[in-house]
Amino acid sequence: IGTTIISKYFEEIGLEHSFVLATNHIKTNNSYRRAKVLWGDTQKNITKSILTIFESVDTIITQGFIGGGENNETTTLGREGSDFSAAVFAYCLRAKSVTIWKDVPGLLNADPKYFEDTRKFEQVPYSEAIELSYYGASIIHPKTIKPLENLSIPLYVKSFLSPKDEGTRIDCCSNTKPLMPSYIFKDNQTLLSIFPKDFSFVVEENLSNIFALFARYGIKINLMQNSALSYSVCFDPIKDDLLQRLITELSVSYSVKYNRNLRLITIRRYTEDAIRNLIKGKKLIIEQRSRLTAQFLVKL
């Protein structure tokens, strides 16, 4: 509906353009809510149609978030699907750049909902943007970045509130500018701790079964930690009945304990001062660190 309204408005103000249906161009499988792009068919459709249209007009309007399934039924592309649609068209058309418009001035080092003194990145490597989005930065999804990275197409994140501002450029640079810690909060996390009933060790066979179960339930694991006798996973909130079904199924072979309403804190390029300030006064449940990333599951 939105694209139809905009197309009609463009007609009224005399802006020459073409209106095309995304479902005729982005072809997907039939996983309706998280459809996977069929890149071969999509490339063929976009190259054949869109390049021809651009010979007569400079502006094309189409929908984001949706594609056409194998039976020509409408599918959706999942979280941040509209940005992903732009990346798909850009990849297939070998675009010079892509700009996505948000309600923030660019890619920030923290969510303004939690921090008053956020800072904007001027430039970010593709790899770092993917890392940030993987850990939960909501501004961009990894699947939007990957096709652009494959062809070195720059991605600009700008604010529709201040369209003349530069925003953030994501490209093949070597380091973020400026170099500073990034903070990501994921609230309302659930922690499941799983123990073999026979006091055996948690080995590959156990982990394989547990991973398969989480995949079947469509649950994305945000943090995991295993010891010789237990395996713990942290994930986003799910419906009570789904959680109970998961626990019931796990309880056939394992003892299960769980905690809810936790916060997962991730710091990229952390400093010890940043860690101290963030976990001060909080009950620490799990802590993990690598060379560049520190994660803390805490009870507020």
Task: Describe the function of each predicted region.
Residues 15, 153, 219:
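Short phosphate-binding/catalytic loops that engage adenosine nucleotides
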Residues 24, 104-106, 159-164, 174, ...:
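Glycine-rich beta-alpha junction loops
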Residues 52-69, 132-156, 192-207, 257-278:
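Electropositive, surface-exposed helix/loop patches at the edges of structured domains
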Residues 1-140, 299:
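Nucleotide/pyrophosphate-binding catalytic subdomain
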Residues 166-300:
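A conserved regulatory-domain signal marking ACT and ACT-like small-molecule sensing domains
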Residues 97-101, 155-157, 222:
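Short hydrophobic alpha-helical runs that function as membrane-insertion/retention elements
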Residues 123-171, 176-179, 184-189:
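A conserved active-site cap/scaffold subdomain adjacent to cofactor or substrate pockets
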